[in-house]
């Protein structure tokens, strides 16, 4: 059996990285602007993504979870905010990361359709 050219990174590691990015984005948003909704959204969505990544770690076939729902929801919310404010940083960065995470989870869903 041939080894893949590039070893595949398990999806849950991307999920944990995405979780850290969302939580840190909420904290940075709170520190820069002093707005509690930034902190609350970062902690809420980061926690949900963390639960999803942990569930995916426990069972790699479990992709219909908090990680998929969180990333898709966050794409919409942060994408609209980025469009409204016309800035890439920081909401556009989070929207882009959420879009990549949603795409990666979507591909995994298509690959493991049971």
Swiss-Prot record:
What is the membrane topology noted in the UniProt record heading this document?
Answer: Multi-pass membrane protein
* Transmembrane helix keyword on record: yes
Kindly give the Gene3D superfamilies that the UniProt entry links to this protein: Transmembrane protein 14-like
Q: Which InterPro entries match?
A: TMEM14 (IPR005349), TMEM14_sf (IPR044890)
Cellular compartments per GO CC:
mitochondrial membrane
Report keywords, A-Z: Membrane, Transmembrane, Transmembrane helix
Q: Per the UniProt entry, what are the Gene Ontology biological process annotations, in alphabetical order?
A: regulation of heme biosynthetic process
A Pfam family assignment: Tmemb_14
Report the superkingdom from the record: Eukaryota
* Cellular compartments annotated: Membrane
- Residue ranges spanning the membrane: these are 8-28, 36-56, 63-80, 83-103
Q: Which family does it belong to?
A: Belongs to the TMEM14 family.
Question: What is the designated name of this protein?
Answer: Transmembrane protein 14DP
Q: What gene, per UniProt, encodes this protein?
A: TMEM14DP
